[in-house]
Amino acid sequence: LPAYADGVRSGIRELGPHLIGQDPLLLGPLNRLMDKALRGHPYVKSPIDIACWDIKGKVAKLPVCELLGGRYGDDFVLYRAISQQDPAEMATNVQSYRDQGYRRFQLKVGGDPNVDIERIKQVAAQIQPGEKLIADANTGWLMHEAARVCRAVADVDVYIEQPCLTYEECL
């Protein structure tokens, strides 16, 4: 199943017959049933799981956040993605996003490791105290490239997100 909207619809058609008559309040057994009926494809199962949490909340007359342990706070901090461009342009964008109220910046990388190193360093130079920088490679690096980038930016306060295709490659 491809990981896009048609894939979700196909997956739900595949799962549907297995779910009819199941209790949506029993999430553990329901998730195990979905895993048995369709291996992988969490993007198909997630909307079903979310809908079941919504049903649980309505039955309990509680917001889902209370079912999950309580509200963490009154709001949460959003991040702003910075699209892949020339490193200097990406760094310049930080100030305009900061002016819009953002304090978390997700830098899109995952192309040429040499250019990505420059992207990370130039954008990091614009980050102020209290702000966060994430470099999201969207699985675009091979393992040796990810290791090289991480070594090159070891002195930079940056989270590296999804560097490689598989979990094992990221270890």
Put a short name on every predicted segment:
Residues 1-59:
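Metal- or metallocofactor-binding catalytic centers and their adjacent structured scaffolds
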Residues 85-97, 144-148:
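Short, acidic/polar
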Residues 96-108:
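Catalytic domains of carbohydrate-active enzymes, especially glycoside hydrolases
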Residues 42, 74-89, 109-110, 138-142:
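Active-site mouth loops of central-metabolism enzymes
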Residues 107-171:
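Catalytic core of soluble alpha/beta enzymes
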Residues 59-85, 119, 128:
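N-terminal small/glycine-rich loop or linker at the start of catalytic domains
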Residues 25-27, 64-67, 159-163:
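Flexible, glycine/charged-enriched surface loops at secondary-structure junctions
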